[in-house]
C-alpha cells in the first residue's frame, strides 16, 4: 500500500512538470560566443571615426562663411583676372571702368568731402612720403580712407594701427617707431606700397592684395588670394582711388602717377 501511494505521487509530479517551465527565458536573445584575440601579426580590423553628433554643427565649419569668396566678389573678379600672370601697371584703367559701369557692383563710393578732409589734414605728409616713389598720392589717400577713414587712433582686432593700419611687424620693418604718429604711419605705409610695386611689376591690384593679405599670400596663390576680405578690399580701394584722383590738379592715370591735391586754402 505504501509503495502504491509513492508511485501515485511520482506520477502526479511527472505530469505537472517543474514549476515555471512555461515561463519565458529571462534573456531569450542573449548568447555567449567566445572570440579569440587577434594575433600580434594581424593588422587592425576596425577603424573607429568619431564625428559631431547628428544635428549639432561642426564648430570648425560653422565659423566659415556661407558663401565662397568668389561668390561675394564675383561681379569684379569674373571680368578682372586675379592671376599674377596678368600683372600690368596699365590695367587699373579697365578695372576702374568696370567698377564704375557694372550694375552688379554692390560697393558704395566714398563721399568726395570725406576724402577732401583727409587730404586737407594730411596733404603735406602724403606729398613728402611719396616723393621719389612709385606710389601716387591719390592711391595713398584711397588706402587711408579704406583702412581707417582718416582716424589716426584706429586699431583693429588683428593689431593693425594708425591711418594706414600697419601691423607691428610691418611698422618695424619700415622704421615706424610710433604707428599713431600720422607722418610716421604714412611714411611706413607708402614705403611698403612702393616696395610692393617693385615686387609685382607695378600692378595695383596685386599690390593692394599684398598690402591686405601679405606678399607671401599673393605668391602662394599665384595672384590675388581667394580670401573674401581681400577680394572685396581691392575693388573697394580702387573705387576710392577713382574719387581721390578727382582731387588732383591733374588726375593721375596710373597708380604711380604724381598728384597735387586741390585742398582748402591752396
Where do the language-model regions lie?
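Second-shell loop/turn segments in exported
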Residues: 109-117, 125-131, 151-157, 172-182, ...
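Acidic helix/loop microenvironments that form the catalytic cleft of cell-wall polysaccharide enzymes
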Residues: 144-149, 188-192, 202-228, 233, ...
Amino acid at each position: 500500500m505504501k509503495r502504491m501511494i509513492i508511485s501515485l505521487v511520482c506520477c502526479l509530479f511527472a505530469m505537472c512538470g517543474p514549476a515555471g517551465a512555461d515561463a519565458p527565458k529571462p534573456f531569450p536573445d542573449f548568447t555567449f560566443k567566445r572570440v579569440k584575440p587577434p594575433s600580434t601579426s594581424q593588422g587592425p580590423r576596425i577603424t573607429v571615426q568619431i564625428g559631431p553628433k547628428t544635428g549639432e554643427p561642426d564648430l570648425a565649419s560653422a565659423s566659415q562663411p556661407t558663401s565662397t569668396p568668389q561668390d561675394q566678389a564675383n561681379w569684379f573678379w569674373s571680368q578682372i583676372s586675379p592671376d599674377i600672370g596678368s600683372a600690368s601697371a596699365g590695367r587699373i584703367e579697365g578695372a576702374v571702368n568696370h567698377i564704375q559701369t557694372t550694375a552688379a557692383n554692390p560697393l558704395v563710393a566714398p563721399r568726395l568731402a570725406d576724402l577732401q578732409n583727409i587730404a586737407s589734414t594730411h596733404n603735406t605728409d602724403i606729398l613728402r612720403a611719396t616723393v621719389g616713389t612709385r606710389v601716387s598720392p591719390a592711391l595713398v589717400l584711397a588706402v587711408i580712407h579704406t583702412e581707417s577713414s582718416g582716424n589716426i587712433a584706429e586699431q583693429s582686432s588683428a593689431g593693425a594701427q594708425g591711418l594706414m593700419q600697419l601691423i607691428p611687424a610691418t611698422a618695424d620693418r619700415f622704421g615706424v617707431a610710433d604707428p599713431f604718429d600720422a607722418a610716421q604711419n604714412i611714411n611706413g605705409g607708402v614705403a611698403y606700397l612702393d616696395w610692393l610695386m617693385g615686387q609685382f611689376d607695378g600692378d595695383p591690384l596685386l599690390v593692394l592684395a599684398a598690402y591686405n593679405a601679405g606678399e607671401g599670400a599673393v605668391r602662394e596663390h599665384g595672384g590675388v588670394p581667394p580670401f573674401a576680405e581681400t577680394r572685396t578690399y581691392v575693388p573697394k580701394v580702387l573705387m576710392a582711388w577713382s574719387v581721390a584722383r578727382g582731387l588732383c590738379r591733374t588726375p593721375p592715370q596710373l597708380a604711380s602717377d604724381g598728384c597735387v591735391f586741390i585742398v582748402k586754402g591752396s
